[in-house]
Amino acid sequence: MAEGGAGFSSSSTSSEEAVPWSTQQPMGWEELESLGDGGGSTSADEEFQWEAMFVKSRAGSPTAEDKSRTFTLPRGRPKNEPRPERGKGKTPKKPKKPDQGATLLVGEEPRPRLGSRTRSKSRSRDKHQLPDDIYDVPNPPMLAPVDSYGNPVEQVSSSESDFEDIANIRPILRRQQPVTVKHRREPSPEPLGHPTFVHRYDKPSYDEEVCQKKDKGGRTKSKNWLRQPGVKSKLTSMKDLSGSFKSLMHIRSDGEKHKQQQRPGGSGAPGGATPRDVFNTFLGSGTCPSFKNAFFLYLEGSMGVGKTTLIRHMREINGDNVISFVEPMFYWREVYSDCVKLIYSACKPFNLGKMSTSNKVLSAQMKFMTPMKCLQTSVRRYVKANEPLQEKTAMDNWLLFDRHPLSATLVFPYLSLKNGYLAFEHFLALAANFTAHEGDIIALLCMGEEDNLKMVKLRNRKGESGVTSAHLKDLGQAFHACYCTWLLLKYLSPEDMVSVCCCDVTLNDICIMRSMSSSKVTMAKSLFNKSMFPTLMDVIQPFRSNCTIIEICLTLFMELKKVEFIVVNASEFIGDIPGVWTSIYTQSLRTQAIKTQSIDWSGLRAFSLTYNS
């Protein structure tokens, strides 16, 4: 014990400043005396043993002098060490002791290294860090946030509101002295001058390009990415963005709207109604309704037979007693697609029997049907409710319609079916949409195919340049087949014809059951062969027992029986529009089954003006 203590004391008396406890040995250092001739020096291999000794020494009872000692790592340069002067060379490095850099002795302060670069505090603290039960290293103070100019800024509490953060920072910014900083873009690397990297806001306007061409010398900045973005370029980009949005939403621009206003029959035509005016007509005229009896006359027939010309003529000579509804050509050609062009392009000889062709024909016929069924529904709002059909007089008024839903749902699909452009299922889907009302009068204008072709060429309507006389002949036969179907339903009930089409009952059996004369039986057989019934029977033959098929046939026959037909040979009245009207007027008064309906005349007239505009 004495030798170990003497040896330790002798090695430490050379520098009493380094070993402050040389005069008095503290209690609890039994391990130091047991080492023998250690000389107080340590090596890298003994570092872990010294740490264990330091931890164990805390178990003893230190003296008052030990309590006053503080084992902290210095955070700066020692006060007694001179600072090296600039310009006089580098300070010579002191020789490194062999025991330096391993473990600090009690009371020894580590000497910082001098040089161009000083070790960071975190590395020094990690290297010389001692257990927590020896001493507590104080935490470094939190760095105060600063702004872009180096001024301290108060910490802003975390909040989800952007306005709250701005309100907390604003008082500090007001206390700062105003600093004027010229706004300019930082110079970018040369590769950013490539057009790929140039922002579209940096594109120069026309004036800037002219200035660049004039200023060729000097230190003019010609790079676009060095220029400050201008207001004009941003507004141009916003306009381009709005144009893209309009294109996405299919909104017409001002130029297209001007073209639409000049287009006849468009919703934006001069004198046309606004959407609010159109909707108000559906709600009523707002005045007391004035009911009048009127004929519901639908003009039907092939194209070019004079339907539109007759409506225009009657509206001019007798406008007070006539309300007309023109053909919805604008909806067919301008709304989303041109169904007239589609039907003519699909019905080509090389497209026979293709399902894709049938899909196109179905799509076109559905668009033909849509405005007619909508008009039919709209007009029924002005018919006096729960009012039976009225007996006609010579002074009754007239409602003239350009085509009935019959053509779009039955006649033209029947023609496409016969020619091989429409599938069976698509024909039944269109026929199931046919509807009619009691009191509907269909004036069928017939004309020979040669005369009809001349009329089509004369009017020169868009999309009808490829119409042939064979097509007009087939179309006339389709209308005649529909007329024969309706005429046969005048002799036999719809239930009887469903039995013939869907059941194993012949037409002869039905005539015998109804006790019909031989002349009527012959007439019924002739009408049956010319009607749509034979074709319909071939279509539904594989599925005659299906409930949906039976319901389609029954509804079709019942709806078709509601209308009344008037047939006019228009070939006899070519160029004689009053003659065509005289024939229609005379047959309407002579046919007992034709009756009139009571309608709100003033409200329906207002609606017709809106519809035709």
UniProtKB/Swiss-Prot annotation:
The active site is at 327 (proton acceptor). Residues 114-126 have a biased composition (Basic residues). It comes from the Viruses. Residues 8-18 have a biased composition (Low complexity). It catalyses: thymidine + ATP = dTMP + ADP + H(+). Keywords: ATP-binding, DNA synthesis, Early protein, Kinase, Nucleotide-binding, Transferase. ATP binds at residues 301-308. GO terms for molecular function: ATP binding; thymidine kinase activity. Residues 78-88, 199-218 have a biased composition (Basic and acidic residues). HAMAP family: HSV_KITH. Homodimer. This is Thymidine kinase. It comes from Equine herpesvirus 2 (strain 86/87) (EHV-2).
